[in-house]
């Protein structure tokens, strides 16, 4: 990573998610330089033109251009959004075979440039592909991050806020585990303005446990619902990627539920999975190990096991 004030972000993959991420970066003034790389040169160049035309309205001047892998050499963050798309009825894990092949080529090209920054992975299945990026790149684990369950956590907080009638930033809770079908809500730590959700259920009979079960189902299945209606999800994940990017560039040491590598935390080893982590200029420098209840521990173990079973045919895992 360059020891200078100019932050360069390279976006690989200018599809729905990548383009939305680029727009969010510029609209929020998060990066100084933005390089877009895509196999479809015309699409990427069109995005560059479109984004540059709105530069007069941006809060911060962002130099934006269509580039090549050579531009990764001076990059601080390379965000990978390239890969096969999730189709209706297809799980994120169904995409493994297709996207592992794509990623091996992409990561090889990036590393050949001399890149020494932070990888931010968005392509699904994100936990698997973040692990693959770590293996293919050879970078330290803290400098390879996936979007993980940051969006799931945001969805959770939004739906909690709607249910309890408060602002989203006053609804606190985490979704952890696989970004997918085995993710879990950490109800034992969920609270509204500091009041545990479990206490609110006891205090007011209008709040019901079955409502909260349905609420989580809506979190877990949100992507499927959106894909059914509009074909793809991209705004929410782009905003979560921008949030992670901002935390890195501003060295916020923000706690975000990214896909991070576990080395004994939560009783798991050698897996990338969505957990709260301290994110700053060095990447995901520390895992925040929550005190889970027994049910949550078992659910998390199951989620990690599902990911390891997918990884095992492709990588030699540590015990």
Curated annotation (Swiss-Prot):
Modified residues (Phosphotyrosine): 224
Entry's localization field: Cytoplasm
InterPro entries assigned: L-lactate/malate_DH, L-lactate_DH, L-lactate_DH_AS, Lactate/malate_DH_C, Lactate/malate_DH_N, Lactate_DH/Glyco_Ohase_4_C, NAD(P)-bd_dom_sf
E.C. number(s) listed in UniProt: 1.1.1.27
Cellular-component GO terms for this entry: cytoplasm
Residues at which beta-D-fructose 1,6-bisphosphate binds: 157, 172
Enzyme class label: oxidoreductase
Gene3D superfamilies assigned: Lactate dehydrogenase/glycoside hydrolase, family 4, C-terminal (3.90.110.10), NAD(P)-binding Rossmann-like Domain (3.40.50.720)
PROSITE patterns: L_LDH (PS00064)
Pathway(s) the chain acts in: Fermentation; pyruvate fermentation to lactate; (S)-lactate from pyruvate: step 1/1
Keyword hit for Heme: no
GO molecular function: L-lactate dehydrogenase activity
Function comment: Catalyzes the conversion of lactate to pyruvate.
Family from the record: Belongs to the LDH/MDH superfamily. LDH family.
NCBIfam families xrefs: L-LDH-NAD, PRK00066.1, PRK06223.1
Protein name: L-lactate dehydrogenase
Source organism of this protein record: Bacillus licheniformis (strain ATCC 14580 / DSM 13 / JCM 2505 / CCUG 7422 / NBRC 12200 / NCIMB 9375 / NCTC 10341 / NRRL NRS-1264 / Gibson 46)
Organism lineage: Bacteria, Bacillati, Bacillota, Bacilli, Bacillales
């Amino acid at each position: 990573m360059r020891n200078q004030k100019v932050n360069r972000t390279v976006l690989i993959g200018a599809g729905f998610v990548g383009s939305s991420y680029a727009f969010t970066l510029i609209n929020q003034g998060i990066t100084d330089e933005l390089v877009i790389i895509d196999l479809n040169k015309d699409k990427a160049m069109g995005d560059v033109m479109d984004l540059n035309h709105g530069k007069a309205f941006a809060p911060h001047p962002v130099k934006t251009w269509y580039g090549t892998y050579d531009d990764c050499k001076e990059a601080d963050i390379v965000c990978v959004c390239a890969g096969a798309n999730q189709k209706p009825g297809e799980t994120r894990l169904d995409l493994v075979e297709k996207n592992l092949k794509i990623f091996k080529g992409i990561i090889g090209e990036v590393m050949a440039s001399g890149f020494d920054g932070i990888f931010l992975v968005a392509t699904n299945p994100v936990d698997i592909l973040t692990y693959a990026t770590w293996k293919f790149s050879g970078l330290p684990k803290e400098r390879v991050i996936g979007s993980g369950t940051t969006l799931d956590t945001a969805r959770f907080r939004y739906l909690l806020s709607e249910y309890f009638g408060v602002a989203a930033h006053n609804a606190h809770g985490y979704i952890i585990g696989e970004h997918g079908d085995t993710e879990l809500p950490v109800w034992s730590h969920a609270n509204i303005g500091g009041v545990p959700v479990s206490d609110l259920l006891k205090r007011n009979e209008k709040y019901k446990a079955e409502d909260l079960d349905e609420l989580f189902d809506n979190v877990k299945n949100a992507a499927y619902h959106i894909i059914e209606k509009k074909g793809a999800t991209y705004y929410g994940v782009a905003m979560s990627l921008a949030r992670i990017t901002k935390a890195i560039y501003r060295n916020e040491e923000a706690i975000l539920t990214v896909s991070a590598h576990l080395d004994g935390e939560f009783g798991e080893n050698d897996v990338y999975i969505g957990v709260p982590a301290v994110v700053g200029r060095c990447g995901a420098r520390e895992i925040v190990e929550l005190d889970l209840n027994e049910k949550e521990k078992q659910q998390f173990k199951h989620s990690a096991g599902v990911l390891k079973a997918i990884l095992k045919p492709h990588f030699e895992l540590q015990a």
